[in-house]
Amino acid sequence: MTQHSRDTPQFYLTAPSPCPYLPGRHERKVFTHLVGNKAGELNDLLTHGGFRRSQSIAYRPACDQCRACVSVRVIANEFKPSRNQRKLLARNADIVGEQRNPVPTSEQYSVFRAYLDQRHRYGGMADMTVLDYAMMVEDSHVQTRMIEYRKRTPDTGITGRGGELIAAALTDVLGDGLSMVYSFYEPNEQHRSLGTFMILDHIARARRLGLPYVYLGYWIEGSKKMDYKGRYLPQQRLAPSGWLRIDASGEMQPEPQD
């Protein structure tokens, strides 16, 4: 009995709370703990089923009478950037991405704090302290990386190191893709569209690693905060019948792909 309870994940349901994305609605989540030697394997399995990771917790929406949150993953090797996205990549050609272990730094927190203060001042993460940030980065029992984005310097070509930190993405490496857990950027660099740039960079990284997907989290039709995730096509969206393909034309394939 003890062995069974240790190896079998236990799931819990949160109490209803106001939905941060759709006004007038309430959200509930089902969650479990990601701990132990099989945390990575469980995280892969749950991500395929529409869960997201936050520290050592895997969760997914379980709202009463609402299924607006739809898990999306970009098909990396088929993705072709649009004309505007190609311009954006060219605009940010002076940025170098550096993959690191998930170790929090004061430099990261400074950018993170500026991002929250300007972009999400009244959000649920607005009061996060430096210790809260450290927990967000370090509390992972799966294969996690921190991708730092820095401006190139005259020495970058020699050292491989960039200069000023302007963005970062906490990213899980799954068996079939990259999952963007949380990303943030310097708000004074708004002209760079760094949020879009980081997604495009992750698609390129997944392709180089031979990984088929980039998991973006939840797309919510009608939510301005989440609508952008539908722009990266082709992609797959999780339906009750399985993952459904959305072509570059925006048309949905009727058959699940998995």
Swiss-Prot record:
EC id: 2.3.2.29
Location of this chain's protein in the cell: Cytoplasm
Keyword Transferase recorded: yes
GO molecular function: arginyl-tRNA--protein transferase activity; leucyl-tRNA--protein transferase activity
Source species, domain of life: Bacteria
GO-annotated biological processes: ubiquitin-dependent protein catabolic process via the N-end rule pathway
Keyword terms, alphabetized: Acyltransferase, Cytoplasm, Transferase
Top-level EC class as recorded in UniProt: transferase
GO cellular component, one term: cytoplasm
Catalytic activity from the UniProt record: N-terminal L-glutamyl-[protein] + L-leucyl-tRNA(Leu) = N-terminal L-leucyl-L-glutamyl-[protein] + tRNA(Leu) + H(+); N-terminal L-aspartyl-[protein] + L-leucyl-tRNA(Leu) = N-terminal L-leucyl-L-aspartyl-[protein] + tRNA(Leu) + H(+)
Function in brief: Functions in the N-end rule pathway of protein degradation where it conjugates Leu from its aminoacyl-tRNA to the N-termini of proteins containing an N-terminal aspartate or glutamate.
NCBIfam families associated with the record: PRK01305.1-3, PRK01305.1-4, PRK01305.2-3
Family: Belongs to the R-transferase family. Bpt subfamily.
Protein name per its UniProtKB record: Aspartate/glutamate leucyltransferase
UniProt source species: Rhodopseudomonas palustris (strain ATCC BAA-98 / CGA009)
